Each structure stands twice: as C-alpha cells, then as structure tokens.
Amino acid sequence: EEEMPICIQPVKAQDLKYKLGIWVRDNTQGIGTLTFLTKEGAYGALGHGISDTDTGALLKISQGELYEAQVVSVVKGGRGTPGELSGYIDYSEGKKLGTIEKNQENGVYGMIGIQEQGKLPLCQMSIGYKQEVCTGEAEILTNVEGEVKAYRAQITEIFPEHADSNKAFSIEVTDETLLGITGGIVQGMSGSPVIQNGKLI
C-alpha cells in the first residue's frame, strides 16, 4: 500500500456541489507467451510491454503474479483481421508460477520458482546474438494445439539499427500447419521464442 500526496481542483457541478472525477486502475491481466527462463529462474515473456488500453502508455507496476494459462480457441487471422489466441488464466490453488517484477518496452520480467519450473516444457538452449541473426529459415515455438510445438518460419529482413528494439527483424510463418490454424502470427503469440541455427534469437 502506498500513499501519495496530490493536489486536485474540484469543479462546481450543476447542483452547485463541488465534485471530483477520479480514474483509478489498480490491476490488469492478460495472456501472453513465455519467451525464456534462465537457470536462476529469471524469465522474460510477452515480447512487448503491457500498456494501458485507454491511453496506450506503458503501465507502471508495483507487483504482479504469473499464472498458468490455457489456449482454448484460435481466431484465424486474414487480410484486415489480426486474429488472436483466446484462453483463460487459471487462478486456482497451485497454478501460480511466479512473480512479475518489471514491465518494460520489450516485455514483462520476473522470477519463477524452482518447483514451478518443473511444470513447464523447458529445453536448454544457447542465446544467439543480434549479429548472428540472418535472413533465412527459423522456427517459432508456440502453443496453438494444446502443447508447445516448433513451426517453420522465415526471417525475411533484418533491422540491426532500428530505433525500436522490438523490431529487430521481420518474420513470416511458412509452416502449413500453423498457417492453417492461425493464418500467420496472431495476437497472443507475442513473445513466442524464435529459434535460428539452434539458438534463441
């Protein structure tokens, strides 16, 4: 709990009483994809920050919790339609995975406990540096069929000096199975790990 002194100018309403209009947002929630987890339990997810739906500003968070989620349906994307993964967050006992400690432009970050890591489909992998990324074949790890699977993709363009670090390269789904299910990359797939030459990029 935090107290913060502020000055507000009330407005006299038609009933001649002074009133304040106050807008408070004390929580937010959403479904995203886990990108990486270190041996120490630090994780990164989502691939972009959580923004206020009304203002578009990056939300400042004091604390958060990470829970298991399930994808229950896919709205296929197409021309003029972004498509999305629909699912639910399981807040039941024992489904909490960890904490959310930072909300930044490139994603949300926090810690996952040792015991909770055992629930996740993990595999150890090297990190690819940006100078190692090249155009050509790659894979996207994502869950659209009830489990995490690798799907073929193509890195079509690289932007090494792009001002927005979220736009380091362009990727196109080439896997016929994934195209048949989602039509390409849809909302909810942000943060899906991209693998090239056996490394997480």
Predicted regions and their residues:
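C-terminal recognition in membrane/secretory proteostasis and scaffolding
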Residues: E1-I201
